[in-house]
Amino acid sequence: MSHEPKSPSLGMISTATRTTATVSPLTPSPLNGSIVPNVSPASQSAHSGFAAALRKLAKQAEEPRGSSISSESSPVSSPATNHSSPVSTPKRGPMGPVIVPPGGHSVPSTPPVVTIAPTKTVNGLWRSESRSVREVESVPHGVSRDRLSSEAASAQEKGGPTVPAHLIGNPYPFGLTPASVMQDSRFQPLNLPRQMPHAVPTASVPEEYLRGFRPYATAEELRMPSLPLGLDPATAAAAAAYYHPGYLPHPSFSHYRMDDPFCLSALRSPFYQLPAGGALPPLHPSAVHMHLPGVRYPGDLSHPSLSSLQSERLSERLQMEDELRQREREREREREKEREREAEREKEREREREREKELEREREREREREREKEREREREMERQKERAAREKAAESHYLTELHGLRGAPDDRAKPDRITSNRPEKTKESILTTPKPIQPGIHQSLNSTHHPVPSLSSAHGLYLGPGGAGPTSLTVATMLQRTEEERWLARQRKLRQEKEDRQYQVSEFRQQVLEQHLDLGRQGEIPDMNVEGHRPVPNHHEPSSRDRDRDRDSHPLLGAPPPLISPKHQHKDHAPPPPTTLWNPAALIETSTDSRRTLHDPPSLGHYDISRLPLPPSKHERHYNSEKLEEGSRKRDSLDKYPPIRPSGFSEPNTFLAELEKSTQSFLNQQRAPLSLSGPYGELSAGFKSSGPLKNLQGHSRLAPDTTLVYDEFLQQHRRAVSKLDLEERRRREAREKGYYYELDDSYDESDEEEVRAHLRRVSEQPPLKLDDSTEKVEFLEMFDLTTLAHREEMMEVKRKKRRRMLRERSPSPPTVQNKRPTPTPLLTRFTPEDMNNSPELEDKKRFLTIFSLNHITQQQRRDNERVEELLQAIKQKSVTLDTIRHNPHPLCRSPAAHSSDQSSQSPVQSEELLNGWPLSPSPSVSIPQPSADPLSISDQHRPLSDPPKPKDSSLPPALPDKCRANDSLPGKSSSLLNSLRQPPFAKESSVSVNGKTKPWENFIAEEFAQQFHESVLQSTQKALQKSKGGALVVLEQNHAVDSSVHYNIPELQSTPGRSKPHPHPPSSQPNGQHCPPQPSRQELSAEESEEEEEEDDTEEDEPSTSRWQGIEAIFEAYQEYAEEQSIERQVLHSQCRRLEAHHYNLSLTAEQLSHSMGELMAQKQKLAAERENLQAELEHFKKCLTLPQSPWSRAHFKGYPPR
């Protein structure tokens, strides 16, 4: 049996089962497969040794007819065994039918035997060997076995049916004693068959069954009878199926068989010879039971048919076969498990390899990304260089070309080209654009604005956002293309095989795009005759195309054209305001050509669109012919829409910068990934800034269609493309181009990374310039969003409000303020006198100065109060500044006794008090408070106070003194004081402007009061008449001078620095000292205080001056704070407890769930185990019951009579 060589393996042995049938058909061995034992290999007990022997035999043997049959059946059994031999064996199909395999009894066990028998050896060597072996083993059985074996051999050679060995009556299948080698080998084979059931296809099993039964048909088939003997009830049933009532003689015919075993074989042969096709298998299961409905083994059947044989022997054999089968089953199970384990290991290894590959791919992607970034950086640098060069060139050409622009159609074409470049290197192209602009770009820009064609060409020029036209198309296209490229690159990594094809595809796409561009753009570009510009574009173009490619490699995720389509320009259809990036679309000529171009790109499909800009040079070429007419048209359009660019050109730098910016922002939008964003932003800015642009806009009126064109044009860009759409488009393209596009590839992790990178890029981009297209704004408003500019305005308003509110005590404080007005006086055993006499007074004063507070004596407080009253009176107009000036003392006379220090301080405070309210800026104004310490905040506003000082600042030292005091006072009050005091003192000594002339101590309270009043008058006058600046300067000087005089309060010393010129000192008279007009006190304070604050909260704020509320206020505030804290703590504690309880409940639930999970898992495992058992049983039953597809016996095919 040619297949035999494979048989050698144990699996083969089991396969051999079929073979056995062939060999031993004569002998009962077919069942047992003892035939093999006859062969020395068989005696090796079906081990690898045996298998090897079988193999040798197979090689040596010629293939007898029977053997071939057996080999065919053998495949069946061998499948069970999973040996190579079984595979070949199937050719012996006829033998295959041996039923034994299902039972796993003799045939399966026989495999070793079978193997040998099928082996060609069977005919020659096998026969002789088997004979000898048989003789040895058959000794007990005697001649009958010998004869059987010889017959079997001859039968095999002849292929004629032989009497089954079991018919002959050998107690053991092959006449071998149970201990005989045959049996050993058979045992293993049996085990193999056991495994066979799992591994072997049912067909193979049936073959073995058939083979077992077929002993009649062929020598090999003769073994079949043994099968029935060894069958389990299940197996028996299967066997019975083979003995279809029609085919098998009914038990009633057993006598007949008994009488003539050969007759039996003859009777059965036709049935066994059923075509391998499985004539038998179709038999209804009922057929199986026909003979052995409940019989455990075909014993019943065999008894009747073999009544001549000793039934004891049959039963013995059956028993033995059962045992063998049992053992085989176990062994097979073990082998099955082993195989499963092996498969598991293999799978694990596979997974490991997969993981390795994945990591490798990841690393590759990482490297790719790095390279990409590197390339991007290089491109960026190149672009910058080019931009610089272009800008220079543009500047020189700008003005000259502005006028020539219209005339130069060629230039226009060039811009187109530039545009194309731009897509490729957005930044670069933009830069490039400026250059072309120099000669023709201006005109092209203009034309761009007007005719769509120019737009396309201008696109390059057209600085990003503005250019919704081809440029944006280009950009979008480019982005998409970049995306595509990147995708392709990824594919390349994942599938090197596809690399070339995909590259070609992308190339092809680019070519197609270019063609599209050429065709579609010809109309447009003609407007911009490329000639003039071409040189620049050309020199950029190659790189631009490359750049395009690069970009493709990292598309902007195929970002659709920027949402902020330049449409906002379109808003009014009026030429876009200079601020907006000019929207080429808006200027688009309505000419059919231009429109066609616009539409064409969209038709191109996103890739095409993205690429459209690429071919400018080609476009230009095409355009040349059309350029002339286009040029004229453009000129018209220029007239219609004066070149926006020209206006921009007038300020070439700005315009370019702005253009660049806008383009950049536009591009950024489109392709956040591109680093170009910066320049484009500039461009757009340029657009906005360029006044000339405005002029252009004014001229340019969009043609009625423009809107349409513009809209459609924009629509292409604006249309958001969903990822799914992109995916679909790519897939379609892949289908058309003939490469395989896998969804998985498109969505690997790198996609997520790209998206993340894209988002990062988008978020890092400078704010977009075109942020106010009505469409966009309306859309955003739906989500309570607004444009950045509008947001800034709103924020400004809010800030003003907030500032006002803060100035006016914020709403929440109001309650506190309400309380504060009536603070319960703090009880203290210290009187102000005690406090003033305390040894640490100096330290305390220093401490107070830290908080801009002044220590005031009782006298000072009184003075302050007086001043406050005076100011109040002035405010209420009961007293006028004039009266004060003429009569200062009466109003507030400070006792001369007061040291100038005191006087100065008190004025300060009083001034603070007076102005205090208005001064609101500093919360604490020194207002005399009942506070235990005669401390009041006088300094807080001091900085403010400085400004009010009269310009003249010719205050005598006293005045500076006062100023200083004022310093300590809230700024306003101090300014008032200064102005009040200044007049007299100024007169006294303008020289003493630097209060240095006199030490403060020299001043008398009265003088101080006078000075104070005068300074107040002056400051008011100043405030009214004088520009804040002068007064401030003077004040500062005064303060600086004064600083020489040292109050205890260090703050005074720093006054100059502190003094914060009132930005709006009350309009002070040029000469602050003479204040003829007496602005109402209110005005003064209001002006001073509020002017300081940018906000215009003048008079209203005055009342809400921050004043020193006294220590009580502090305590009160602290108390409130403590209360709030405790409330907050309570809330948090309760919340915390609630959460803890919740958490506890959740953890309990989690525990329960984990328990139930564990139980479920256990049950699942149990079920799985049960299922496995059931499955195993099922398999077993299947093996037993499936009818083998019985190949016709060789004899049948070769025309041997059935016998």
Swiss-Prot record:
Transmembrane segments: none
Chain intervals with Low complexity compositional bias: 66-79, 894-910, 918-930
Coiled coil segments of this chain: 314-398, 856-885, 1150-1186
Biased composition (Polar residues): 12-47, 441-457, 971-981
Bias-annotated ranges (Basic and acidic residues): 137-149, 313-428, 530-554, 622-639, 939-952
Cysteines engaged in disulfide bonds, as pairs: none
Annotated keywords: Coiled coil
Full protein name: Genetic suppressor element 1
